[in-house]
Amino acid sequence: MGKHTSEHKNHAQIVQLLQDGQYFFHKGLKAYKERNLKRASKLIQRAVHLEPEDSEMLSQLAVIYSEMGQYQESNDLLDYIMANLEAEMPECHYFKANNFAHLGLFQEAYKEAAAYSDADPDGEFAEENDSLLDLLDLGDDGIEDSLYDQDELLVKQDRAKSLLESGQLAEAVAALEEITTEYPELWSAYNNLALAYFYSGNVVKAKQTAYEVLSHNEGNLHALCNLLVFYYYEREDEKVAELSDQLSNVYPMLLEQRYKLGATLALVGRYEIGYKWLKSLYKTGFEGDDTFFYWLSCSAYFTGHTDFAETIWRKVESQYPGEDRPAPWIERREALPSSVEQRLAAYYISSTKGETEHLEAVIRSKRITAPFETHFVKLLLNGDSAAADVSEDALFAYQTVKLLEQAEKEEMKTEVMSCWVFHVIQQIRAAAPLKNEKGWAAAICYIWKEAHGKQDTKKDTAARFGISPATLTKYMKYIDDILE
């Protein structure tokens, strides 16, 4: 009996130890000293999850983020510490100064270094901070130029965000590419660029951009969440399972990161974890948009919190009247989304059958996350009258398909041809200028008919599309190159 009691007591002590944030914190420090930064960050994230108001743990995590190249995430944590836990923690200013310097934001770096010097002139990092101030002191003209550059960056970021949200995707891509060229370690701009590529239907470049972020900034939560969304919509199920398992063990402190993680996991069907993070935000009074409440309601329903889910959805309907869309759990009972090409083909075939109600429901649905697809469906519904309100990519796809429809009306109604056509269009959008729809359409038509034993002469095909045989040959070569 005594032995059993002793064993039970020891077991309880072990459990208590494992639940103690200090346990994970010291394990994390050990990993940090061994320069295993990835393991250190994960362990200290666990510690912070258990003891979220421990400023020492949070500041150590911020230092690790900085050494991993996650400068913006590090600064976000340091801001959180000073705003919510310890307003008088001078070293936060020094750490922020270094992060800003790495990001190329030298005026902000100078301000933070000066703040550290004022708050703790003889502090632990005084010597290093003085060296940083000397390095950053470019004189009045230099500081003025730096300030102008940073103001210009903020304007550029705001403009790019506005373009992205309004569906002006070609312009958003151009703006974000310019920002990433000028600020090669501003990972938030890369993440937005990846989304802009994805929304445009350029999934290849979207993935490449996310991979680029992660190659330099391993553990970047926004990049990982973006990548999970890309895998999900491309039906790469094994990668979805692997990455969602990885993200299920992440413990974000910041509200924005909780929102991103919760909504992403809910999207891919990891409702339990998604609900945990979204509900934690709701409890804090987080002022989310309709998308936040959509995924909160959805994840609540599929984790058995049906009354709460229905309450939240009624709130969405009252705050956003006129949307006329089904509750998320009704939409989510439908089959998982197919590839982009299959979805585009399905929309097109629906339009040839006059299924306008179905296409209008698609527009209202949250199932589409890419403005490119929404714009394409709008064109199918409204024709060229919608051209002024859609992206260049969507208009190119629509006009190319309509040219093919005029030439091969019955064939285009078949799923086999339409899926192949949209596959080629997707590759064109990823790798070629969106010009001369007649040239592209003629080449697509000729290659398709040749592959199916229905070959016309190049002269006849070119004449049907109003181009020269030489132009047809040129665009056939383009397609051969991009499909290799």
Swiss-Prot record:
One Pfam family this sequence matches? TPR_16
Question: What superkingdom does the record give?
Answer: Bacteria
Cite the repeat ranges for TPR. 21-54, 55-88, 187-220
Keyword vocabulary terms for this entry: Repeat, TPR repeat
Protein's recorded name: TPR repeat-containing protein YvcD
Is Transmembrane helix among the key words of this record? no
Position of the signal peptide: none
